[in-house]
Amino acid sequence: MALTMTLKEELARVPVAATPERRAETAAMLRFAGGLHLVAGRVVVEAELDHGASVRRLRAAITELYGLAPEIVVVSGGNLRRGQRYVLRVVRGGEDLARQTGLIDQRGRPVRGLAPALVSGTTAATAAVWRGALLAHGSLTEPGRSAALEVTTPGPEAALALVGAARRLHVAAKAREVRQSDRVVVRDGEAIATLLAAVGAEQTATLWRERRERKEVRATANRLANFDDANLRRSAQAAVMAGAKVERALEILGDEVPDHLRYAGRLRLEHKQASLDELGRLADPPMTKDAVAGRIRRLLAMADKRAAERGIPGTDAASEG
């Protein structure tokens, strides 16, 4: 929870001058934190957030972009909920706001995913969509085996749209249903840091990387303390050589690497001291150690074949250097 609040605190302060990006962020916040209600025949837009600065940012954007005056109601946490919740409502002009932000179409019908304009915008607008989604319903957990950057979505259509937006930012995300709730999850360590930086959370990205590195160092120290010194040296040397070969293979192949082989290679590079068995457990979804070893072998073989065709040093050159 601490990292989530740190992230939202930083995102709520990200300056955005361009109107298209502000509109994209606002629309995303309303989509992922909001809902539509009919009150006495009028459309009311409502959004519920757990962070004061975020709801104030949303209110300011709605006022400045659309000339409307949202009201904010503070709801104290009860037995099942910790902390305060902030409910933003737009009653007067709610239908116009819903239409302009893509919550309903021109005929007044609810839009289930994200409006086409949000999905096909510029890179900056795409980052704004993710920033809005994180402010609305995002969470960031501590580095470790269960580390994740996650957004709870109102439905599968919005989840798939957010996955597509992540892809445009060169980040692999997955849509999942967890306890009857649709979510978008980013688990790869480097991908999490990349996405955090893309949405403007540079300080949180740095903090997350530092904690991740410290955790890996501690885990490595704890694991290696159980080994005999000679075995330790041999294991460490083998891991360094394997990592160097994989790095050389990815360099040789560039964009030609199949996704499943690239994933195995990135696992090896991100966890250089881990055994194949541990790499398999770290994979998402988990793999056997034989499956991990097989993918890495195929990656190296593919790279060596391509290196031979191009007349350049293969993967063995990395370990020799």
Curated annotation (Swiss-Prot):
Gene3D superfamilies for this protein: Homing endonucleases
Keywords for this protein: Cell cycle, Cell division, DNA-binding
DNA-binding residue intervals: 275-308
Superkingdom field: Bacteria
GO biological process, one term: cell division
Single GO MF descriptor: DNA binding
PANTHER family in the cross-refs: CELL DIVISION PROTEIN WHIA-RELATED
Family: Belongs to the WhiA family.
HAMAP family attached to this UniProt entry: HTH_type_WhiA
UniProt-recorded name of the protein: Probable cell division protein WhiA
Organism lineage string: Bacteria, Bacillati, Actinomycetota, Actinomycetes, Micrococcales
